[in-house]
Amino acid sequence: MVGSGSIFDQVSPPNDIARRLVDAGVVEPVDLAKVPAASRLFPVFQRPAWLEKDGKAWGVPYSFGMVRIVVDADKVKNPPRSLSVPWSEAYRGKVSLWDDMETLYMTARYAGIANVYDMTDAELATTKEVLLKGKPLVKKYWFSAGELDTLYTSGEVVASNAWETTLVNAWKSGRNLVEIVPTESRGGWTDSWTVAKGAGKNPCTY
C-alpha cells in the first residue's frame, strides 16, 4: 500500500495483517455511524482487538471462518484428534500445507506455544525447527483452494490444512473428506474492510 499511491479507497486485510496497516498509518479510522450494519454483527466482531486502537475502530469485519485440518477418510483410518497428522511418517509424501502464515501459526500450536500471534524469538525458532522437520513429508504447499481440491481429487494427498470450501467441494463430488478437531485447537480468520488514509472524505467509500 505504501508504494502504490492513492489508487484505491478500501482494502480488505485478514486479522493478522490489519493491525500492521493501522500501525503503518496507511488506513484511517472508520466512521461507524456510516456503517449501521456493523451494529448487527456478532458482539465479538463489533469492536475486535485487532481493529481497535486509541479508542477508535479501524475496520469492519465481513467474513470469518476456521483453518480446518482435513483428511481423506478412505485412506486415513482412525486419525488422531491432533495437529500431529501432517507430521506423521505414515503420510509421507501425501501431505499438503497452505503456503501461508496460517501454517506457521498451526505449527506453533502443535509445538505447544501459547500465543502463536506474538511469539518470542525462541518460540519462533522452535516453530521453524518443527516446520522444517515436517517438510520432507509434504507433497506440495498449496496456494489456492482449487489447487488443493485437485490434489485430493487426483489422490496425491490424504491430509492437509484447508479452507471450508475444500470440504464443501469434496462432499458435493462424493469424496469422503472429514475434518479433524484437534485438541491443540485451530486457527480462526476474519477479513475486514478498512478505509485507505484520506479516502474517508469520498462519499462512495461508505
What is the predicted role of each segment?
Residues 1, 38-46, 188-193:
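Short, charged, surface-exposed secondary-structure boundary motifs
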Residues 1-9:
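Periplasmic binding protein-like
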Residues 8, 12-153:
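Extracytoplasmic ligand-binding site segments that recognize negatively charged/polar headgroups
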Residues 8-12, 141, 158-163, 179:
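Paired acidic/hydrophobic, glycine-rich loop segments that form the ligand-binding mouth/hinge
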Residues 17-22, 153, 159-176:
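A ligand-binding cleft/hinge motif common to bilobed small-molecule-binding domains
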Residues 125-134, 173-197:
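Periplasmic-binding protein-like
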Residues 196-206:
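Extended ligand-binding regions for polar small-molecule ligands
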